[in-house]
Structure formats: structure tokens, C-alpha cells
């Protein structure tokens, strides 16, 4: 679990804080090394994480108290699921585990961001 926290921190810190809107998704498979793939996935995940947080904040500010509480609880459970699910992929053998964990974080984060954006 500690390694997933480190991965999440790397993903968050690797994004440019100046990116207001995400660029079109890069094809991370075009990278030349595992490290470049992992960095690409981290960059893309950070972009989607920013979108997710903006959508969450927008929803929280517009919902009545009862629905805010439900969204807060759902989001906390979603974070637990994401962390546990991606920790499974991170626990694999070799450097491919880093790629699989990065793909997991990108896939789940982008899906959740789109889900919340659709509700705003």
C-alpha cells in the first residue's frame, strides 16, 4: 500500500500546475522506455485528477446537504477502491507492474472524472 501512495504522489507532482485544460490524451505506447511510459501515464493521470477534483468541487457546491454527504461518502469509497485495485496491479513482477499500475490509475481516474462531469 505504501508503494501505491508513492506512485500516487509521483503522479500528482509530475503534472504541470499550469495546465488549465487537459491536452488530448497522448498515446503513451509511443514512449521509448518503461520510464517514459510511466511518466506519460502519470502526466495523463494528473490531468484527469485535476478534472475530477474540479467536477467534485463543483458538485459539492451545488448539492443540498444530504446529497453532498452521499457524494462525499461515495468519493471516499471510490478512492479506497481505486487505491486497492491499483495496488493489485502494482504488486506484479518486474517493471511492467509500474506500467500496469499507471494504466489502472489513469483508467479509473478518467472514468470517475467523466462520471462526475456528466452530473455537473
Where are each of the predicted segments found?
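Positively charged n-region of N-terminal signal peptides that target proteins for export
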Residues: 1-5
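Bacterial N-terminal signal peptides
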Residues: 6-16
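N-terminal alpha-helical modules
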Residues: 18-120
Amino acid at each position: 500500500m505504501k508503494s501505491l501512495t508513492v506512485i500516487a504522489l509521483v503522479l500528482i507532482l509530475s503534472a504541470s500546475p499550469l495546465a488549465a485544460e487537459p491536452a488530448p490524451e497522448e498515446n503513451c505506447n509511443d514512449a521509448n522506455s518503461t520510464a517514459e511510459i510511466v511518466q506519460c501515464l502519470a502526466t495523463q493521470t494528473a490531468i484527469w485528477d485535476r478534472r475530477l477534483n474540479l467536477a467534485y468541487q463543483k458538485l459539492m457546491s451545488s448539492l443540498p446537504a444530504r446529497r453532498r454527504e452521499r457524494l462525499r461518502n461515495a468519493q471516499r469509497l471510490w478512492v479506497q477502491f481505486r487505491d486497492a485495485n491499483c495496488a493489485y496491479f502494482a504488486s506484479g513482477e518486474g517493471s511492467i507492474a509500474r506500467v500496469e499500475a499507471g494504466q489502472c490509475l489513469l483508467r479509473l481516474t478518467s472514468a470517475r472524472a467523466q462520471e462526475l462531469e456528466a452530473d455537473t
